[in-house]
């Protein structure tokens, strides 16, 4: 039972930290705030994570694995009648300020120099996502190019910037419709 309690505390700390990082950024949230909001001692925190960098890395790994699972489910599901519906679901999953991708997106801009190992986690996910989108495109368009998957990921990033600036999902949807018509 003790391991289950320890696991619960570590998981709570991961999710608390992820939410704080999404709201305030990686550099404005310190260990003190995380342990306070996760209701754990600093000693317990360092016992689980050893450092803030390791915590960030684990937060990003959790987000990455959740996203991979969801993207695979979308790309393998037969419930979507065509490519347009699959791409729409992948796009909407990522172009969301409350979603798992937003933390990985923030990491690209905020942690490169301070936390290089965690930064690599975010880059690896983007590379994986581009490859996955390429194969989704390739299944329906025999002449799909890798550049199209690059454009799709850049479009997701642009939608996030748009949401940060105006917080209007309408702009996000307009961008997607333009891409899908091409």
Regions found by a protein language model. Give the residues of each.
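Short helix-capping/turn signature of helix-turn-helix
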Residues: 49, 107-115
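Hydrophobic/aromatic-rich alpha-helical bundle segments in the mid-to-C-terminal region
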Residues: 106, 138-180
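Short amphipathic alpha-helical segment with a characteristic S/N-K-E followed by hydrophobic residues
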Residues: 13, 51-57, 66
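Short hydrophobic/aromatic patch on the recognition helix
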Residues: 17, 39-49
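Base-recognition residues in the alpha-helical recognition helix of bacterial helix-turn-helix
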Residues: 22, 46-50, 58, 62
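Amphipathic alpha-helical packing segments from all-alpha helical-bundle domains
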Residues: 65, 97-100, 115-142, 146-150
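Hydrophobic alpha-helical connector segments
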Residues: 58, 72-99, 152
